[in-house]
């Protein structure tokens, strides 16, 4: 009888620990969406413009040379 009670308490304790961990993991995923998949991160990565592409600033071109709104 004592052993059964100890086992039941242990199982309940471990279940509570898992539920707490799962809830905190899901909460941290919502708070830090930028730590998501690498596909999402690659979409957010700014790339430079190649030769012949339309530009507005020198810094947006890979060569840092924007003349008449075209990268050189």
Curated annotation (Swiss-Prot):
Disulfide feature: 48-62, 55-66, 61-71
Propeptide: 23-45
Entry keyword Secreted: yes
Transmembrane stretches, start-end: none
InterPro entries documented for this protein: Conotoxin
Keywords carried by this UniProt record: Cleavage on pair of basic residues, Disulfide bond, Knottin, Neurotoxin, Secreted, Signal, Toxin
Signal peptide segment: 1-22
Tissue spec: Expressed by the venom duct.
GO molecular function: ion channel inhibitor activity; toxin activity
Region (Disordered), start-end ranges: 26-45
GO terms for cellular component: extracellular region
Classification via Pfam families: Conotoxin
Subcellular location: Secreted
Tagged with keyword Hydrolase: no
Membership in a protein family: Belongs to the conotoxin O1 superfamily.
Domains as described in the record: The presence of a 'disulfide through disulfide knot' structurally defines this protein as a knottin.
Name recorded for this polypeptide: Conotoxin VnMKLT2-0221
Species per Swiss-Prot/TrEMBL record: Conus ventricosus (Mediterranean cone)
């Amino acid at each position: 009888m004592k052993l059964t009670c100890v086992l039941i308490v242990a199982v309940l304790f471990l279940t509570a620990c898992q539920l707490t961990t799962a809830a905190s993991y899901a909460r941290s995923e919502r708070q830090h969406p930028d730590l998501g998949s690498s596909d999402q991160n690659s979409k957010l990565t700014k790339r430079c413009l190649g030769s012949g592409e339309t530009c507005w600033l020198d810094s947006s071109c890979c060569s840092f040379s924007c003349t008449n709104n075209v990268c050189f």
